[in-house]
Design a protein with these regions (language model features):
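Short, basic/glycine-rich phosphate-binding loops at helix/coil junctions
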Residues: 22-27, 108-109, 168-174
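Residue-level marker for the onset of beta-strands and adjacent loop->beta junctions
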Residues: 9, 17-18, 122, 128-131, ...
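Divalent metal-coordination and catalytic microenvironments
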Residues: 9, 22, 33, 61, ...
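Conserved beta-strand hairpin/beta-sheet module of binuclear metal-dependent hydrolase folds
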Residues: 1-50, 154-165
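Metallo-beta-lactamase
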Residues: 36-37, 139-201
Length: 201
């Protein structure tokens, strides 16, 4: 993955998916939406090239293409994890994940790697109504943007850069989807208006 500078200490790792990166100091960083397990090697290579170790992972929501690698970075690097309340509730256990993914059996939850990887301890839960967060020493703004997922959030870094998760989708993503997944269409449309009204860089 290619590390691209956005502004200040805010970067993005560009590859098959975009992974947010906030550099805390010369050797540590936060990852935002580290994506699927297919990206782990590429992320690690980009971090090694930059001399960075992830100490925290934040996710806008718990879908596999944003959250699946979270447990890996927690177990491998000791990175702290952070998700919004409802998303954290879903990934706390195999049972809670099964409750959310009702069309999968418990046997599938326990044996399909993509599903098993979603189950992960959450060190810092973003409570309802919480709009500011200090995570691994980094002050972040939290913008509630439900719709695509039940408790989707956006993160604004100290550089005033917004990581919008799946509130916004690229033309490539839209072209490849007959109908983009939305948990609640009315909420999703309201959230798009919220993001459009942000004064971020």
């Amino acid at each position: 993955m290619k590390r691209i500078h956005v502004k200040g200490n805010t970067w993005v790792l560009e590859g098959p998916q975009l992974v947010g990166l906030y550099q805390i100091d010369e050797s540590t960083c936060l990852l935002l939406d580290p994506g699927s397990t297919k990206l782990q090697g590429e992320i690690e290579a980009a971090l090694a090239q930059a001399g960075l170790t992830p100490v925290g992972v934040l996710c806008t929501h718990m879908h596999y293409d944003h959250h699946e690698s979270t447990r890996y970075f927690r177990e491998t690097y000791g990175a702290q994890t952070c998700l919004p309340q409802l998303e954290a509730d879903i990934v706390r256990s195999e049972e809670s994940l099964k409750n959310h993914l009702f069309n999968f059996t418990m046997g599938m939850i326990r044996t399909i790697p993509r599903l098993q990887n979603l189950v992960c301890p959450v060190d810092r839960v973003i409570a309802f109504g919480e709009t500011e967060l200090v995570f691994c020493g980094v002050p972040l703004q939290v913008v509630r943007t439900p719709g695509h997922a039940p408790d989707h959030v956006c993160f604004i870094t100290p550089d005033n850069v917004c990581f919008a998760g799946d509130v916004l989708m690229t033309e490539d993503v839209l072209a490849g989807a007959m109908v983009p997944f939305v948990f609640d269409m009315a909420d999703d449309l309201k959230s798009k208006e919220i993001v459009a009204g942000l004064s971020c860089d």
